[in-house]
Amino acid sequence: MKKSNFSNVNLSMGTGRRKSSVARVYIREGSGNIKVNNRDFDSYIQLENLRTMALSPLVLTNTLGKYDLYINVYGGGISGQSGAIRHGISRALFELDESNKMILRSNGFLTRDSRKVERKKFGQKKARKSFQFSKR
């Protein structure tokens, strides 16, 4: 996580991960523009609960509308991608201003959610479910 001067503008970057999704979030001061894979944020993430979940770090730190966000996200589905976006935004906000650490840490936004899909085992119907057992 490096701070760099990109065309004389302070740019901060954070990488977020969730399930099999990876999001790279670039934050710089602006008017609140949010682009995900060169598309508008609302058209990329259409479910309202996923949208609010992804933007919750900005709401908690009272920075919604103060920064422009450019996000590249790939892998997984829309739920994993929005979780990765939330993780990336949190890391970038922490890099931008370290006073955000306590707020983000207490809500668990800086912690990587390590839950993944458990693999199916042979001799069983699913990961944990067994085939139906018949005594006779």
From Swiss-Prot:
Coiled-coil regions listed in the entry: none
GO molecular function list: RNA binding; structural constituent of ribosome
Domain of life of the native organism: Bacteria
InterPro entries membership: Ribosomal_Su5_D2-typ_SF, Ribosomal_uS9, Ribosomal_uS9_bac/plastid, Ribosomal_uS9_CS, Ribsml_uS5_D2-typ_fold_subgr
SUPFAM superfamilies from the UniProt entry: Ribosomal protein S5 domain 2-like
UniProt keyword list: Ribonucleoprotein, Ribosomal protein
Protein's UniProt keywords contain Ribonucleoprotein: yes
One GO cellular component, as annotated: cytosolic small ribosomal subunit
Gene Ontology BP terms: translation
Protein family: Belongs to the universal ribosomal protein uS9 family.
NCBIfam families: PRK00132.1
PANTHER family assigned: RIBOSOMAL PROTEIN S9, SMALL RIBOSOMAL SUBUNIT PROTEIN US9M
Protein name per the record: Small ribosomal subunit protein uS9
The species this protein was found in: Borreliella afzelii (strain PKo) (Borrelia afzelii)
Gene, per the UniProt record: rpsI
